């Protein structure tokens, strides 16, 4: 029977801690919650190779400890279907990764993990291994996002001197979109895309021990978005140092 105090049963871990304290035994520290790992999917509704990667990404977004961001590129728009979520900004970001990884060019589908490793987006084994490896690393920056009410939030970034000069990015994304494809390589298919990034912009650079930003989960036109992510990253699409995510819808 578990010992009681004031007539209430005490949790076994508390009893163990009290026993250890009385006996002078030190217990191992509680495991820290792993820092979020940023997983970016570069995809297009006009790419016939992308649906399997989109499906894998749909599984990844449900993983704990993952900040999943779906970037739709624009370089497949010319073959018949204009991806409504595509942006030149997202293509440019992928091109920066291509230079960082010393690739000869860009391709879809591609998944980039923590800004350090790029894999074919439909290669489940390689992608999952990259995520598992990234989760083992200690973050160099932490991001806490507090909901203030409605679509207003506040992000607080904390880091040491090693993060000085890092870029701080804001992503606004929608949880899910289902689209009937009328032309192009995926003509006749109905595609589902999740964590679709709608806006990507720089908030500033990290210059000290702490940085705060008041955010609105909407674009300049007032279109609201379901999710907000803040990413701390070395310049020119370098390694990601830390990230945080929050949902308003």
Which stretches of residues belong to each language-model region?
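Short, low-complexity polar/charged micro-motifs in intrinsically disordered terminal tails
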Residues: 28-29, 245
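Active-site-proximal cofactor/substrate-binding loop regions of enzyme domains
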Residues: 30-105
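Glycine/alanine-rich phosphate-binding loops at beta-alpha junctions
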Residues: 6, 22, 30-32
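Bacterial N-terminal signal peptides that target proteins for export
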Residues: 2-16
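A subset of signal/propeptide-processing and intrinsically disordered low-complexity segments
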Residues: 8, 27-28, 118
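Bacterial N-terminal signal peptides
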Residues: 13-25
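Short, conserved sequence motifs used for protein processing/export or organelle targeting and
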Residues: 84-110, 116-249
């Amino acid at each position: 029977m578990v010992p009681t105090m004031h007539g209430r049963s005490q949790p076994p871990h508390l009893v163990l801690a009290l026993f250890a304290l009385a006996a002078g035994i030190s217990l191992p520290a509680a495991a820290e919650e792993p820092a979020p790992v940023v997983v970016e999917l570069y995809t297009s509704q006009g790419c016939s190779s992308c649906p399997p990667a989109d499906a894998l990404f749909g599984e990844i977004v449900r993983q704990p400890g993952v900040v999943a961001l779906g970037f739709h590129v624009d370089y497949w728009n010319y073959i018949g279907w204009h991806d409504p979520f595509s942006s030149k900004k997202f293509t440019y970001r992928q091109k920066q990764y291509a230079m960082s990884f010393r690739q000869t060019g860009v391709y879809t589908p591609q998944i980039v993990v923590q800004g350090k490793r790029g894999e074919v987006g439909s290669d489940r084994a390689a992608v999952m291994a990259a995520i598992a490896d990234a989760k083992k690393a200690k973050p160099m920056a932490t991001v806490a996002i507090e909901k203030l009410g409605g679509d207003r939030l506040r992000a607080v970034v904390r880091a040491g001197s090693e993060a000085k000069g890092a870029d701080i990015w804001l992503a606004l994304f929608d949880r899910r979109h289902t689209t009937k494809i009328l032309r192009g390589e995926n003509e006749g298919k109905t595609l589902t895309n999740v964590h679709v990034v709608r806006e990507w912009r720089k908030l500033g650079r990290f210059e000290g021990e702490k940085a705060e930003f008041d955010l609105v989960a909407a674009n300049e036109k007032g279109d609201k978005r379901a999710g907000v992510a803040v990413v701390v990253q070395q310049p020119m699409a370098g390694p990601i140092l830390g990230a945080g995510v929050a949902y308003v819808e």
